[in-house]
Amino acid sequence: VIASRFDMAPTSAAQTQTFSPPPMNSEPLGGPIDAGTFREIAKSQTDMVVNIRTESKRETSLNDFFGGGGGGNDPFRRFFGQPTPDQEPREETVQAAGTGFVIDSSGLILTNNHVVEDATKIEIDFFGDEEGNYYEAKILGRDPLTDSALLELIEHPDQELPVARFGDSNQMAPGDWVMAIGNPFGLGHTVTVGVISAIGRPFYPVRGRSQEVLQTDAAINPGNSGGPLLNMKGHVIGINTAIQSISGEFNGISFAVPSNTVSKIVPTLIDNGKYPHPWIGITGKDIDPDLARILDLKQAKGFLVIAVVAGSPADKAGLRGVSQTQVIDGKEYPLDGDIIIAVDDKEVRKISDILIHLQREKSVGDVMSLGILRDGEFMHISLELVERPDL
């Protein structure tokens, strides 16, 4: 897990929390980048990153102690040919480590939701604290969909801490240098560098629900979650959140939640403890070459609406799902259904284009215009976005 932190200064825990991200500087970095550039960023930004230590409770049994769980892994069955004896579950304390960064002088720390969501105790370790002090924190707000969590310090250090700055994640492009700072394997502050590998990647922090992330090859390992991904100005342009790996360790593919996404939701997390994500209320699939051929489309692009949730904005706006199918060569294909090809006059090639537009540009209560193909005819449909329900 990684956790990052924006600067903070000591305050009273009872102080009213406010948050206003500093203006983003979108100008490209000028001048050459060399080893000195990385050294200077690491030196100037490491102090604003924190280590997060958590404790959580889980129920365990004798099977867990021996690594059992039934089947061929059960030691009683393996060695004695006997069933596992009945054992009352017992509660166990589990410790974990992550990263975070302070985003406001009142003592607000940003990290990943998965770092703290089950925590019964959260402690913060500030870089450079030679006495090894840990400061207790609590969860102020969480957003599982963007894997973001906002912490508030209960205990405060005596000294004022440096403040991290947000950069404009929309300005990042493949090939741009980035730096990650985190707490891999609980080792403490560690710096790695890489480049942006891709932008606009779909990511699924909650099953069936996708969000946009940045992809990087900067080394991220367990303990890094929640830490900052920095551009070459030392500005936070992402929160490191996950890796793609069979082994569970770094394999060259890491993901970060864009800073623009986070800065959008933080004020609402402060006020309400959660963020209401806008919702359309449809299911469907991207148009691929086979589907384009069956539906007699000139190009394999767009998003086919297969089903519309009753009572949803899409339903109220009159969006239509699939009503007819046909089996061709043993595979069932839809023969109708609205095809979304634009949102607010922006082209839609696949579902990720819709989701990214919702994430970047839209909020609950906004009106969104859909450009659709229905029975070969182009038309516009407008709908009012509502809060995504817990389906």
Predicted regions, residues:
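Serine-dependent protease modules
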Residues: 3-301, 306-310, 351-366, 376-380, ...
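Conserved PDZ fold ligand-binding element
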Residues: 109-113, 316-351
